[in-house]
């Protein structure tokens, strides 16, 4: 019994350490961009560099884990914004727009991931580039099954991502984001705006 308790405790500690490293790595990457080092992440996470390597192996594996984590968090946020009472085409696309327009930490993280210049150098890592392509393809596939035309999906999706990118660099305030989200939700509903522009 004592060894089982110790094993559970050790697993929890490993999970906490992993979470701390992922959170710290995200913050350091946003600050340092592709020049991020394992030493910087280890310092920010409060772990030794050897401890970080134990969990992630090397820098590329850490970066890949960060990107995977941010995508998982964002997918969860999109699903939280899914309105099950909307029984008409575009339900998932509207949830995507709401999630990108939300102010949650996870939404901001994915806006940073998908939009911030500081991440661009990370896409040179083959596994990261493949994951980004895979995620884009998966979103496209799910949106295509959502009942709207491909053209409408493209316009709404890319506009929402653009608004999110502008928010990251400070070009949009909360009011303008809310206005844009409202217009995009209208466009993802029946293709028309409720009020004149």
Located regions from the model:
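Solvent-exposed, amphipathic alpha-helical segments
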Residues: 24-31, 77-80, 159-166
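Helix-turn-helix
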Residues: 20, 24, 28-61, 65
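Alpha-helical DNA-contacting segments of helix-turn-helix folds
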Residues: 63-70, 77
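Hydrophobic alpha-helical connector segments
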Residues: 76-114, 181
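N-terminal intrinsically disordered/low-complexity leader segments
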Residues: 1-16, 195-197
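Amphipathic, non-transmembrane alpha-helical scaffold segments
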Residues: 14, 67, 71, 129-136
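Hydrophobic/aromatic-rich alpha-helical bundle segments in the mid-to-C-terminal region
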Residues: 105-108, 126-197
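Generic transmembrane alpha-helix motif of multi-pass integral membrane proteins
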Residues: 115-122
């Amino acid at each position: 019994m004592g060894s089982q308790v110790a094993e559970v405790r050790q697993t929890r500690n490993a999970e906490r350490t992993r979470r701390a490293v992922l959170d710290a790595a995200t913050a350091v990457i946003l600050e340092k961009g592709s020049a991020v080092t394992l030493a910087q992440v280890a310092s920010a996470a409060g772990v030794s560099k050897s401890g970080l390597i134990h969990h992630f192996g090397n820098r590329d594996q850490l970066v890949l884990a960060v990107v995977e984590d941010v995508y998982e968090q964002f997918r969860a946020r999109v699903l939280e914004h899914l309105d099950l009472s909307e029984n008409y085409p575009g339900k998932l696309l509207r949830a995507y727009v709401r999630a990108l327009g939300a102010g949650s930490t996870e939404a901001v993280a994915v806006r940073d991931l998908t939009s911030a210049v500081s991440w661009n150098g990370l896409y040179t890592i083959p596994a990261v580039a493949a994951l980004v392509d895979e995620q884009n393809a998966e979103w496209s596939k799910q949106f295509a099954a959502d009942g709207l035309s491909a053209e409408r999906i493209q316009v709404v999706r890319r506009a929402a991502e653009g608004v999110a990118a502008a928010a990251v660099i400070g070009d949009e305030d909360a009011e303008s984001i809310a206005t844009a989200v409202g217009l995009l939700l209208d466009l993802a509903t029946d293709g028309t705006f409720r009020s004149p522009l």
